[in-house]
Every structure is written in C-alpha cells, then in structure tokens.
Amino acid sequence: MLIDQGQYELTILIWLIIAISTFILLMFIRAPYGRHERPGWGPRLPSRIGWIIMESPCILIMTVFFGFGVTKWSVIDFTAITFYTMWIAHYIHRSWVWPARARITGKRMPFSIVFFAVAFNSINSWINAEWLYSLHHPYPSSWLYSPQFVIGFVLFLIGMGINIKSDNILFSLRHDGKTDYKIPNKGLFKWVSCPNYFGEIIEWCGWALATWSLAGLSFAIWGMANLIPRARSNHKWYLKNFSDYPVERKILIPKIW
C-alpha cells in the first residue's frame, strides 16, 4: 500500500477533475496524431515506436503490482488472476499487436503526445493496480459469480471484440501496403464512424462494473473524455475529406450520435 484510503480517494477526485477538463479541451483542440497529425507540436518520433512506448507502462505497472500480490497468496486467487488477464489481454493488443499490424511505417507523432500518454497510462495503471492488488485486495472468490462482475465481464468481452474487429476492418483497407485513408463500410462502420472507440468505451464501462470500484469508474470516464472528442474529430475529418462519405452515418453510437 503506497497511500491510505483517504489519500487514494482524493487522488481519484483530482484525477476526475482533470478528466473533465481534458474532455472540454479536446472538444476544441484535436490531439495531433494519426490523421490529425500536424506540425507545430515539437520534435517527433516514428509512430510505431511512440505507440509501444506510451502503452507499455500499462503492462509493466499492472504486472509489478500483480507480482507483489502473488507473493502474499496463501491460496490461488482466481479473482486477482482474472482481473490481471483482462487488463493484460487488452494492453498486449494495444501496446504490441496493434503497432505491429498498423500501416504506420514512415508516419510520425509528436514526442509531446507520447510524453502525456505515458504520464496518463502510468497514473491510470497505478490507480487501478493499487486498488486491485493493494487497497482492496483480496476480492472474495465468490466475486466472480456476482451480478456486477458477470455483467461487467460480458460487456468487457463485447467491447474488446468490437474494438479488435473494427481495427481489423481498418487494417484490411490497407492490405495492399498503401497508407492512404479510405472509407470503411463493413461491420459497425455501416452505422458509425468510430466503432473501435465505441467498443473501447463499452470495454472500460464493463471493467468499471466488474471491479465495482472508483478506479474502474475513473478509467471509464477518462476513456469517454478522450474518445468522444476524438470520434467527433474523426467524423468531421471524414466528411471534409470524402465527398461521398455517408451523411447518415453517426459519430459513435449507432442510431443515436
């Protein structure tokens, strides 16, 4: 335990205030990476390396806390193993699989974006790991059968499936090795511009339910604070750059927005 319960809850409160402020800021300023990358944001590095650097702390920090937790076990803690597996499954894909598959050779991102992403991922991973394997450890073994865990776990899997499936559709648009952007028309892309973000939001809402914690809730809120403005920017970008883009297609939530 690095801090007591009161200090931890105060940290999350401050973290949530920053999330809301970030949401407001990103509604007016497009984060300069990917299709929105532009000069004026300082030194840049290869995008593939940047992605690996900025996402890998999530694996490292959670693994360190999980490892220390294992040393205290008197019996196998299946709940702790399940939460660790959920987290690591997402971040192995996000940190290593996605950058390896993405057609981003030759593309670059600002070092400042990598720096802020490392800071966010480190703090967010610590908040969740501290709760799971220190402050609240252990969850009872019966937790895996509780309604909140079962519903949350199912949502997590559904969201992860949508996220990966949508990424695969985007990858398939560049199977010829070209890096030009194209209009995706398969899967949930028929209804929204950013189903990959929609899936990730569902995923972390599921995590919040499954852990039934302020840590999980703060991550879900942060996910929305980052991905909702990003989805809006991507949708506007499609409309601006493709004259034949389906005008009836929503931004993030099918049939709604």
Predicted regions and their residues:
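Membrane-helix and juxtamembrane interface regions of eukaryotic multi-pass membrane proteins
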Residues: 1-116, 257
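Hydrophobic transmembrane alpha-helices
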Residues: 2-25, 64-65, 69, 75-76, ...
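Juxtamembrane membrane-interface segments at transmembrane alpha-helix termini
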Residues: 95-100, 126, 230-237
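Active-site pocket-lining segments that scaffold enzyme catalytic pockets across diverse folds
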Residues: 109-129
